């Protein structure tokens, strides 16, 4: 028994359109999830993750660097983005030397300038933090 609504549609037709449309979009969603899951391992740079990178991430988290800096766009906007700091400062050894010297030289006490606190990190912690920042800079963000 189908009751006709205005415009000639029946309740059964409306139900079928709803179910068909819902199924269509669920399948589209599942396809996109599958595609994304297949592509993520190519972009995460997980193969290059070393123990130094893991320790560097721990230094990053313990000192709340994200409280002032951004990393891949996430975090606070008080201080510079650090995902590509190594590449911006010359890459390879020169980038690492710059980052470590900068960290050791803080605060600069320049009037009117934002100051980074001195964290008194050991050379090992600085090396690990630099490795973490290098690794982060090599993640394929596809230019976002």
Locations of regions flagged by a protein language model:
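Post-cleavage N-terminal segment of exported redox proteins
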Residues: 1-49, 132-144
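Arginine residue identity/basic-tract feature
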Residues: 15, 39, 43, 55, ...
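Short cysteine clusters
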Residues: 65-68
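Extracytoplasmic electron-transfer domains, predominantly the class I c-type cytochrome c fold
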Residues: 51, 58, 72-76, 83-140
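Short extracytoplasmic/periplasmic juxtamembrane "stem" segments immediately C-terminal to an N-terminal membrane anchor
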Residues: 45-62
